[in-house]
Structure formats: C-alpha cells, structure tokens
Curated annotation (Swiss-Prot):
L-aspartate binds at E175, R219, S363, R367. It catalyses: tRNA(Asx) + L-aspartate + ATP = L-aspartyl-tRNA(Asx) + AMP + diphosphate. Belongs to the class-II aminoacyl-tRNA synthetase family. Type 2 subfamily. The gene is aspS. It comes from Methanothermobacter thermautotrophicus (strain ATCC 29096 / DSM 1053 / JCM 10044 / NBRC 100330 / Delta H). This is Aspartate--tRNA(Asp/Asn) ligase. It is found in: Cytoplasm.
Amino acid sequence: MLLGDLRRTHYSKDIEPEMDGDEVTVMGWVHEIRDLGGIIFVLLRDRDGLIQITAPSKKIEKDLFKSIRKLKKESVVAFGGTVQESGKAPGGFEIIPSFLKVLNISKQPLPLDPTEKVKAEIDTRLDARFLDLRKPSVSAIFKIKSRMLHSVRVFLEEQGFLEINTPKLVASATEGGTELFPITYFEREAFLGQSPQLYKQIMMSTGLDRVYEIAPIFRAEEHDTLRHLNEVISIDIEASFVDHEDVMKILENLVVRVIEDVNEHCTDALETLGRTLEVPETPFERLEYDEAVEMVNSKGVPMKHGEDLPRAAEKALGEIMDGYYFITSWPTAIKPFYVMPDEDDPERSHAFDLMYRDLEISSGAMRVHQHDLLVEKIKRQGLNPDSFESYLSAFEYGMPPHAGWGLGAERFNMTLTGLKNIRETVLFPRDRRRLTP
C-alpha cells in the first residue's frame, strides 16, 4: 500500500514516558508479536530501537484488533495511537493503537531471525544481508562506523586537510607486486587501484600540502582470514613540510577524537554491543622493530630480524601489549620504495605501523622526496622506473619533504566494536569467495 498523506511523527528515540496522552504515528517493521488472546503485544522496530504497541481487545476497535492479529513478522507497518507510560515496556512507554496501515507484507518463513533468538552462521547472514542488517546488534556496527568516518572528516578538516578523490582505474601497480585486479580498459589492460599512495605524493608537488581521502581500495591478495578483505575503505592522509613523528601525532590524536565522539554520540549502539570504550592516553607507546622482535622471541615465537611480522608474532605481541601502540624503525628492505631510510642508519627506515593489540590498523612513513634516491630505490626493488614515469616527474620540479599514512576503516571499526571478523564491519563484503549480494 502507498503512504498517501500518512507520515511518521516520531522515531522510537523521540518518544518519552512524559509524553503520556500524546498522539503519535510510528512506522517500521514488525519485530515480534505476542498474542495472549484478549491482548496483543507488537514490538515495532525502527532504525533507533523498539516500540511496544499494546492492543487490548476491550479498548480498541474490533476490526483493528483483528487486523493486528493477522500481522506477519517483518511486515512494514504504520501505527497511530496514544502514548501511555508503562514501566514494563521498552523505553518506559507503550502505544495504544487507534489505527494500523500495512504498507508491505513480508514473505514467510524468514531466511533468518532478526530477533536473534535463532542464531545464524555468517554465510547465511551475508546471503540475507538485508534482513541481517535489521538486527539491532548489526545496525549498531554501522552506526558506529558512520560516526567514526564523520569524526575522521571533521578532525582532518580542522587540521587543515583538503579532501581529494584519486583515480581507482590505474595503469600499473602502486608498489609492484601481483595483488591487482586486472580489467579491460577499452583496448588496454588496466587495474583497480590498490592504494592512493602515488597520487597522494603527487599532490604534495601541487602546493596543496595537506590532503586526505576516504575511499575503497582493491587488493587481489591470497589471504583469506578474519582480518582480510579484497575491497576495503582506506583513510589516507599526506602532508608536506612534516616528518613521520608529526603524522604519528596526527594519527594518535585522530584515534582519541574518534573514540570520544563515538562515546558521546553512539551510547545506545555501544550498549547494544556491550562495549565500553576507554579513551587512550597520548602519546601512544612506541616500540622499535628490534624491540618487537625481541618481545616476540621471548614468547617462544621464532622470528628473525628483517622479517615482516607473521601472524604468530602479532598474536604474541597482542598478549604483551594492550590497546594502541606504534611499531617504528622498520627495516628499509621490507618497506616500499617510497619510504625514507634513516640518514644515520640506512638499514632502518622512518616507517611505522599502528597496532591495536594483535591487529595492524595503519601503516605510514616519512617519504622519499628526492627524485634520484627514489629512482635508485625503485631499481633496488627490481622495478622499472619507466613504469612510474608520471609519478616520478612530480619529483623533478620541487617536491617538498612529506609524510603520511593509511588507516583501514574496517579494522579501525573492529577495535571500536570488538568484532573478530572483518566481514561483519562491511555492508556487503568482498572476499575470495563472495561477489554477491
């Protein structure tokens, strides 16, 4: 049925017990129905919560009572009625209905249970994601994610950053390697962008010396774990006339701001998830790479200097370290060509990772801004400088010193929500096995 002139007057969060006697119109989905014979209770769900519709047969019209009795779970309805204070109902109030309009009837049986009384496996949930997202515990994840992204934008704008949009159709790899999705671009081969890194650095040559981007990146990596996806949202910044220490401070202050904002604006969502977020103190603890290797070995996990952190090493660190912390001074040999080596010890670099317990959520570095050194490093990694011609040209005409980082939005949201599976932080995740819905 169509709405006609009917419109919602209140969401669930807008109604309070003090509104006893007020007339309201509410709209949403039939979450649950309890028919006790002479009285029917309907839990109506909207984006903000649940509203109890209480229908006593002796107090409402006979035809209305019959219509309520016929309702099916997850049908879309509009109720009008009178607010009545009730200590037993959600939010301390109930609505005694005066009319019902059924806007759409849901097919039965349901592929999964939005009340969560019957649990479903992750694949079942993702196959029927539109229903899964109706669960309060699932919608809470994305309310927090939305606030996090909003907070990031506000914070970076306050710090003088300009939002940019870089190409997602690219001619070559950002860092070499094979983690690329090839596509046909007219008569040529192109790829989905795996990182905005090179474009961020090119922007440093334009005079727009503080930029950020929040956008999808695509990586055809082999990993099929609870922490990896093939399409994610990356929060990237780049800034000129700064070094790695400066952008690390920006990153830790951003994390603090986000947590403060989520605590302030997402109290209901956090309560739904059973989460209590402590605001971390700054500066975050810093471990040099060499220290991290020693700590990993002390936990009985073999790791050699010069290796990237394997999963076992991350787990070992997570048992020692709590909260957010940086790993700094990574070996130059295992970092990308654009990472600046330490002038006093070229075997070490000005690169860092931000960790949350055993989870890497961000990587960044001071960048190489000298053209000749950059060409040398590209060659040293077995890559052809000719493949980076348009990138390198920006370094020949006045490139300032610069630094930056990329922060994984989904992994960051895992730290806020306490989720263990990154797929749960994406509306419609893409991994090696899933391309729909």
